[in-house]
A protein has these predicted regions:
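Active-/binding-site microenvironments in catalytic and ligand-binding cores
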Residues: 1-157
């Protein structure tokens, strides 16, 4: 059996914030029905992610995002990965964010039964290792389509 050909990874992420990005994308999708973000900047000191939404979340919804994130972290969900060929990708997983030259064998990352997506980044072993999640700020930029771009700036500690 020959070894699978995999894409290389050319950047170093801060694993707690990067894993929190996965949880946050899934939380936003569940709360607002939006797609995973296509624009994220993840760092140790602060991270920011944008989503396209039909309306700006209320202060109560923003507080709920932070609360849900900290509940998921406290739940100590296991984080695992597995290499899967494209023919065996779990149902519902979208591959449209992958680069054109992505290999046929993909590294899938599972966070408990809460989230699964292809990713070659670094992650913690369980959500408890993230520590805590704090929203530093949010912003809303209206778009001509009637919705807008919602940004969350966050920190993990």
């Amino acid at each position: 059996m020959t070894a699978p050909i995999l894409n290389t990874h050319n950047k170093e992420e801060y694993a707690p914030a990067h894993t929190a990005e996965h949880l946050l994308n899934q939380t936003m999708g569940r709360m607002f029905g939006c797609e995973r973000s296509r624009n994220a900047h993840i760092e140790r000191k602060k991270s920011k992610i944008n989503w396209i939404l039909p309306a700006c979340p209320t202060p109560e919804q923003i507080a709920e995002i932070e609360q849900r994130m900290n509940e998921l972290i406290a739940a100590d969900l296991p984080v695992r990965f597995e290499f899967v060929d494209r023919e065996h990708i779990p149902a519902g997983v979208k591959l449209d964010k992958l680069p054109e030259d992505a290999s046929e064998m993909l590294r899938m990352v599972w966070i408990g039964d809460y989230d699964v997506c292809p990713c070659i980044g670094t992650h913690v072993a369980s959500t408890k290792e993230i520590g805590s999640f704090h929203i530093n700020s949010t912003s809303w930029t209206p778009l001509g389509t009637g919705g807008g771009s919602f940004r969350i700036v966050f920190k993990t500690e």
